[in-house]
Structure formats: structure tokens, C-alpha cells
Amino acid sequence: MSEIQDYNSSVSDPSSRKFETFSYLPELGVEKIRKQVEYIVSKGWNPAVEHTEPENAFDHYWYMWKLPMFGETDVDAILAEAEACHKAHPSHHVRLIGYDNYAQSQGTAMVIFRGPISAKC
């Protein structure tokens, strides 16, 4: 049996913080984010955008940007809403969520824009 590798993290170390899906991978580029939105749409999930201050990123509740985009299938419209949220709140983390109506839960959630991370977080 192999040993379990410990994940060294610290709330006081900004470079060690991880956020949800894909946070252990290199940062997603524009095309990869587009692919994730296409996946959300292909699954029939309802996209939504949320944001919060970096110091509150580990709280359970983030601010919802408008309402979830029920039935939206236009990838460009979804990306435009995420970009609008980022422009309105440039110092906040912005995450994209895909709500699964059937399972009545989040199908996916990922931080797509990160606000500046300071040691006080």
C-alpha cells in the first residue's frame, strides 16, 4: 500500500490556497473556460455567477451576480455575464457554477477570475 501524501496548506500562505474544481491544476485560459461553459450547457445545467472578496473566499456564502441564467444556452452570453461581474468587482474572486436541476445540486463550480490575494485572507 502506498503512503498518502500530505497536502501542505496554510490559510496564512496565499500561494497554498485552493478553490474548488481545477484549483490544483494550472490556471485555466480563456479557451479552457469556454470549454467548461460548453460542458455546462451540454449537460443542461443552469449557469450562475457568484463573487466574493478574497478574504471571504472560504465562507459558505458568496454574492450571487444577478439570477442564475435559467435555460441559457448561449456560451458567449454566459461568458459575458462572468466578465461583467469581474469588471464590476475586479478585486473579487468570481466563480462559475452549473446547477443540476435533476440532482438539485451544483454539477460543477470553479473560480474563473481571482482577486488579488493578500496574506490577511
From Swiss-Prot:
Keywords: Calvin cycle, Carbon dioxide fixation. GO terms for molecular function: ribulose-bisphosphate carboxylase activity. InterPro entries: RuBisCO_ssu, RuBisCO_ssu_dom, RuBisCO_ssu_sf. SUPFAM superfamilies: RuBisCO, small subunit. The keyword Signal does not apply. It comes from the Bacteria. GO terms for biological process: reductive pentose-phosphate cycle. Pfam families: RuBisCO_small (PF00101). SMART domains: RuBisCO_small (SM00961). RuBisCO catalyzes two reactions: the carboxylation of D-ribulose 1,5-bisphosphate, the primary event in carbon dioxide fixation, as well as the oxidative fragmentation of the pentose substrate. Both reactions occur simultaneously and in competition at the same active site. Although the small subunit is not catalytic it is essential for maximal activity. PANTHER family: RIBULOSE BISPHOSPHATE CARBOXYLASE SMALL CHAIN 1, CHLOROPLASTIC. The basic functional RuBisCO is composed of a large chain homodimer in a 'head-to-tail' conformation. In form I RuBisCO this homodimer is arranged in a barrel-like tetramer with the small subunits forming a tetrameric 'cap' on each end of the 'barrel'. Heterohexadecamer of 8 large and 8 small subunits. Belongs to the RuBisCO small chain family. This is Ribulose bisphosphate carboxylase small subunit. It comes from Alvinoconcha hessleri symbiotic bacterium. The lineage of its organism: Bacteria, Pseudomonadati, Pseudomonadota, Gammaproteobacteria, sulfur-oxidizing symbionts. The gene is cbbS.
